[in-house]
UniProtKB/Swiss-Prot annotation:
GO terms for molecular function: DNA binding. This is Sugar fermentation stimulation protein homolog. Belongs to the SfsA family. Pfam families: SfsA, SfsA_N.
Length: 240
């Protein structure tokens, strides 16, 4: 296990999503407010009466008692926390768990959230050749027929990230976009052409220009997450 939940998760049932970041869950027979740490649609996951696991959270500024952590889908636990991939990939780098074919293999971790252009990326690394690597991480929860797909909702922000990663090539950076699949039933990753053609085209163009595109899947349990495998990436419109 490379990532463990600090406290035991609490069982519940999903009831209804109220907005992007708040839902109702049933805990011990009572309806409670719960924070949804993911702005994606997740329509195939968040169905009434679906078993979920929650993290108990406290704070004076909080309006909810829990964070939604895991959702059970067709016998597989799915981690829906979009903040988690940053922690997961940092662990993969620092513990040298990435395969030799990864752009970040053997790289040194430099810092989180480096500034670039009009915004920030998720992290910056230094390769064994002293090249600066800019990393943008994407959380993936959607899998159809063993194919992991991103995004599950249109994302102008995601498209801009790809364009800025491509721009960084001219300044000598080695940029990469990494799709972390927080479930273990995917065998391949692809952009979601049907949901967001503009993002998908931008991903193809970025890869053609030299942006590294990688994807990794994780085994999810009520105790935590473990690295599962690197997934092949296809950018074709249709996958046979």
């Amino acid at each position: 296990m490379i990532y463990n939940f600090i406290d035991s998760l609490i069982e519940g049932k999903f009831q209804k999503r109220l907005n992007r970041f708040v839902c109702n869950v049933e805990v011990n027979g009572e309806s409670r407010l719960c924070h949804v740490p993911n702005s994606g649609r997740m329509k195939e996951l968040l169905l009434p009466e679906t078993p979920v696991l929650l993290q108990k959270k406290q704070g004076k500024q909080r309006k909810t008692d829990f964070d939604l952590a895991l959702v059970l889908y067709e016998g597989h636990w799915v981690s829906v926390d979009s903040r988690l991939p940053n922690k997961l990939f940092e662990i993969l780098v620092k513990k040298s768990l990435l395969p030799e074919t990864s752009v970040a293999y053997g790289a040194e971790f430099l810092r989180r959230e480096p500034s670039y252009g009009r915004g920030r990326f998720d992290m910056e690394l230094m390769s064994t050749n002293s090249d600066r690597i800019l990393i943008e991480l994407k959380s993936v929860t959607l899998v159809q027929n063993n194919l992991a797909l991103f995004p599950d909702a249109p994302t102008d922000r995601g498209r801009r990230h790809l364009e800025e990663l491509t721009d960084s090539l001219r300044e000598g950076y080695q940029p990469a976009v990494i799709f972390l699949v927080q479930r273990d039933d995917a065998l391949c990753f692809a952009p979601n052409w049907e949901m967001d053609e503009a993002f998908s085209k931008a991903l193809v163009q970025a890869q053609e220009q030299g942006v590294a595109v990688e994807s990794y899947a994780f085994k999810v349990t009520p105790e935590g997450l473990n690295y599962c495998q690197r997934l092949p990436v296809t950018t074709q419109r249709e996958v046979e």
